[in-house]
Curated annotation (Swiss-Prot):
Protein origin, superkingdom: Bacteria
Protein name: Imidazole glycerol phosphate synthase subunit HisF
Catalytic center residues: 12, 131
Keyword Kinase attributed: no
GO molecular function, one term: lyase activity
Chief location bin: cytoplasm
Pathway: Amino-acid biosynthesis; L-histidine biosynthesis; L-histidine from 5-phospho-alpha-D-ribose 1-diphosphate: step 5/9
GO CC, any one term: cytoplasm
Location(s), subcellular: Cytoplasm
Enzyme class: lyase
Length: 256
């Protein structure tokens, strides 16, 4: 595990606006990703993740503008994912101020994307986002955890544990592990999945999906996560970043 646990808010951006409701009374415009990023920076976020949910080429320039405006205001690492298909996409995001870039579906379709990006920019730049779920009924994977796409709607038949190992070999710098079963439930992270991935990879794991309260975060770290990511509980003001860090610290882990 890395020395200090990182707490990372995630913002879904659609055509330059934040989607999934965000409730901060002190913001003029809760739909502006740059304002929200600045608010989380003030709250003590260690990093920020933007997910471009439109991610079509027509909106790529909008996202580039959002990233460059954000990078002028916040001084913590910024990861941008969604619709990244080529090393050129990575290049344009890094040039406008992203520190790391997330890949998902494009890497499943062409795993060489991981090695091409890692060789050109360094593996510290590359975050592999994995949307995994437990297989129901008949199992097609050895581990029982399957990679999905389309926000969990489409099965790939790929074993999630095999995929993270392969991605590490190809040069991924981090794994953003999102449990599609836990996502949105606010019932806690999928600890078994985190443990299963931790056994197989040495690179950092960012746990995502399922956080509902501050006390949900320390068990994810205990299970092997190096960083924890959440969206709605931060956006709705249910829990602050400070409260999450306090809970992690109280459990005996180091925070920044």
């Amino acid at each position: 595990m890395s020395l200090a646990v990182r707490v990372i808010p995630c913002l879904d951006v659609d055509a330059g606006r934040v989607v999934k409701g965000v409730h901060f009374e002190n913001l003029r415009d809760a739909g502006d990703p740059v304002e929200l990023a600045a608010e989380y920076y003030r709250q003590g976020a260690d990093e920020l993740t933007f997910l471009d949910v439109t991610a079509s080429s027509s909106h790529r320039q909008t996202m580039v503008d959002v990233v460059s405006r954000t990078a002028e205001q916040i001084f913590i690492p910024l990861t941008v994912g969604g619709g990244v298909r080529t090393p050129e996409d990575v290049d344009s995001l890094l040039r406008c101020g992203a520190d790391k870039v997330g890949v998902n579906t494009a890497a499943i379709n062409d795993p060489t994307l991981i090695s091409r990006v890692a060789e050109r920019f360094g593996n510290q730049v590359l975050v592999l986002s994995v949307d995994a779920r437990r297989e129901q009924g008949e199992r097609h994977t050895q581990s029982g955890f399957e990679v999905t796409t389309m926000g969990g709607r489409k099965s790939t038949g790929i074993d999630a544990i095999w995929w993270v190992k392969r991605a590490q070999e190809l040069g991924a710098g981090e794994i953003l592990l999102n449990s599609m079963d836990a996502d949105g439930t606010q019932q806690g992270f999928d600890l078994e999945m985190i443990k299963a991935v931790r056994k197989e990879v040495k690179i950092p794991i960012i746990a995502s999906g399922g956080a509902g309260k501050a006390s949900d975060f320390p068990p994810a770290i205990e299970a092997g996560a190096d960083a924890v990511l959440a969206a709605s509980i931060f956006h709705y003001g249910k829990v602050t970043i400070g409260e999450v860090k306090d809970a992690i610290k109280a459990a005996g882990y180091t925070v920044r």
